[in-house]
């Protein structure tokens, strides 16, 4: 037999032998981590104070609530969590669309074109129409609520004449009827920076306008895939309807959005031209957040996940950022977005967001990359203690920005720590 064959066998046996030692060492690190307990306690402290996104926001946002509802379940009774979800259903649009967030009607005044509903007179709603993730976020939130509390009675609750179960499907129908592109078989939205809600063509950028350049991206479609999986688990009798849709979106994400040569997702498929200069090569940009959500949607193989985290680590090194929560690398150049906050490495254009970095950590743990997850978790939990809070985002120099009680960050880090503790428990039982 070939000598290389025996070398390969020996290497494989060595890897198998070292795995228990590696796991044992990691378990010790998890159990003695100097930041985990502080972060857990701080997360519970922050989430007790309410449901708005953070101290810089008056609204309860569904894309945020989706990432801390499980944490909220630790400190609030079921009916409180359920009531927040019911507000979104009572304010559902006549076409099935879901609002971004709601605020007490008497406090409405933040520049939005507010939405009102006879079913929910207490609140004013708003919707950033450049996004295509509100409906998916609500389905995921209801799923997490049921998983966390065991209370599936919410599915039979009524908002007006429709049950929650009916409204969940209606929200998915909205996406297929109003945000689905037939040519590519994928959902569309405005051009934004990865998962962001700011388009380049407007000073604020949260609404579709006559200048909008419509595009397809991985984040919106990966969120939809996760929502469809959740919906079919909540409503198994509807699986026959939604399974083919899920399969179509999954296949088309791989076909049209995955760049096999460069082992990354392309930023956008443009439906009516790009808002950026003709000589700009947008595919040089690597989207961290959309990639993390795509992994959650099951779109990448183990080898592709490994390549993804290696690329993210390299991007952090090249940019000088603090963590793999870096939204993208490189960022869009100066002046590409009319919103002045979207300067290179500013806000969603290359800011460092634990809110998405924490989701990548979760997926690394779930996909057997616990060692890498632990390594990349450290800067995120360290800065919580260093800054005594969960900040919305960080500059490339690791300086905290935005809300200091950003509940989405608290939620994803808390959940990641739960997964590390589960990993330790399961390995101790082996």
Regions found by a protein language model. Name each.
Residues 22-42, 60-61, 98-100, 173-176, ...:
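Catalytic cores of carbohydrate-active enzymes
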């Amino acid at each position: 037999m070939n000598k290389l064959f025996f070398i390969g066998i020996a290497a494989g046996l060595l890897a198998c032998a070292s795995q228990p030692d590696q796991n044992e060492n990691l378990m010790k690190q998890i159990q003695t981590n100097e930041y985990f307990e502080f972060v857990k306690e701080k997360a519970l402290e922050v989430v007790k104070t309410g449901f708005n996104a953070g101290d810089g926001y008056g609204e309860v946002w569904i894309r945020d609530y989706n990432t801390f509802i499980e944490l909220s379940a630790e400190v609030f009774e079921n009916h409180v969590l359920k009531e927040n979800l019911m507000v979104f259903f009572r304010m559902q649009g006549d076409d099935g669309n879901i609002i971004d967030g709601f605020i007490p009607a008497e406090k409405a005044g933040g520049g939005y074109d507010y939405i009102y509903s006879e079913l929910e007179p207490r609140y004013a709603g708003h919707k950033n129409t450049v996004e295509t993730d509100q409906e998916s976020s609500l389905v995921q939130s209801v799923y997490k609520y049921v998983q966390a509390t065991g209370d599936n009675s919410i599915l039979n609750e009524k908002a007006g004449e429709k049950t929650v179960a009916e409204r969940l499907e209606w929200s998915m129908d909205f996406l297929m009827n109003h945000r689905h592109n037939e040519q590519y078989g994928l959902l569309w939205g405005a051009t934004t920076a990865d998962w962001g809600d700011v388009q380049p063509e407007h000073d604020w950028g949260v609404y579709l306008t006559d200048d909008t350049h419509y595009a397809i991206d991985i984040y919106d479609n990966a969120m939809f895939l996760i929502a469809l999986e959740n919906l079919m688990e909540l409503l198994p009798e509807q699986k026959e309807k939604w399974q083919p849709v899920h399969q179509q979106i999954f296949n088309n994400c791989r076909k049209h959005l995955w760049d096999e040569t460069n082992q990354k997702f392309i930023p956008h498929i443009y439906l009516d031209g790009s808002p950026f200069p003709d000589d700009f090569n947008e595919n040089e940009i690597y989207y961290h957040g959309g990639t993390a959500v795509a992994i959650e949607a099951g779109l990448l193989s183990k080898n592709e996940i490994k390549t993804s985290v290696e690329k993210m680590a390299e991007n952090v090194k090249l940019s000088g950022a603090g963590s793999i929560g870096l939204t993208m690398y490189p960022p869009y150049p100066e002046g590409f977005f009319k919103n002045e906050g979207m300067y290179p490495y500013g806000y969603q254009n290359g800011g460092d967001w634990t809110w998405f970095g924490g989701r990548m950590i979760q997926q690394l743990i779930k996909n057997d990359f616990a060692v890498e997850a632990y390594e990349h978790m450290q800067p995120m939990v360290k800065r919580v203690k260093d800054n005594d809070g969960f900040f919305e985002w960080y500059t490339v120099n690791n300086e905290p920005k935005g809300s200091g009680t950003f509940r989405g960050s608290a939620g994803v880090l808390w959940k990641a720590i739960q997964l590390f503790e589960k990993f330790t428990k399961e390995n101790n039982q082996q």
